[in-house]
Amino acid sequence: MKTISANSQTVKRDWYIIDAEGKTLGRMAAEIAHRLRGKHKPEYTPHVDTGDYIVVINAEKVRVTGNKAKDKMYHHHTGYIGGLKSISFEKLIQKAPERTIETAVKGMLPKGPLGRAMFKKLKVYAGESHPHTAQQPQALNV
């Protein structure tokens, strides 16, 4: 019996939809990262992108536990001297709710070209509507 190694031509990718309303950010992000990598499939291969497409709706209604809404800070640098910017979870969820989920998932994926390819399969939307109805995504309970 030969060992089967997946390649990009043999991988079958499914579409899943997750409703983030009332879900805890970290627990949901861990499951999304797991599925984007393809670790739930028997043909998982570490050096091949075997993951599925994930559509997340209601990103504005995701929750965090404890005082993280006020205390959790997101940092980025503008590239200019003294350009370190910080924003709290509370303000970021009002300004760009998609970024909270995207940042959490991106930190859980591999760093490098393969991780960037996996991240492109994540689609996050603030509200109920999304443009991926033609792909007929299956509901996924996290």
From Swiss-Prot:
Record HAMAP family: Ribosomal_uL13
Q: What does this protein do?
A: This protein is one of the early assembly proteins of the 50S ribosomal subunit, although it is not seen to bind rRNA by itself. It is important during the early stages of 50S assembly.
Q: Which GO terms describe its cellular component?
A: cytosolic large ribosomal subunit
> Which protein, by its recorded name, is this?
Large ribosomal subunit protein uL13
Give this protein's Gene Ontology molecular function annotations.
mRNA binding; structural constituent of ribosome
- Species source reads Teredinibacter turnerae (strain ATCC 39867 / T7901)
Summary of subunit composition and partner proteins: Part of the 50S ribosomal subunit.
Question: Which family is it part of?
Answer: Belongs to the universal ribosomal protein uL13 family.
- Quote the Pfam families the UniProt record gives: Ribosomal_L13
Q: Name one GO biological process term.
A: negative regulation of translation
- Keywords, comma-separated and alphabetical: Ribonucleoprotein, Ribosomal protein
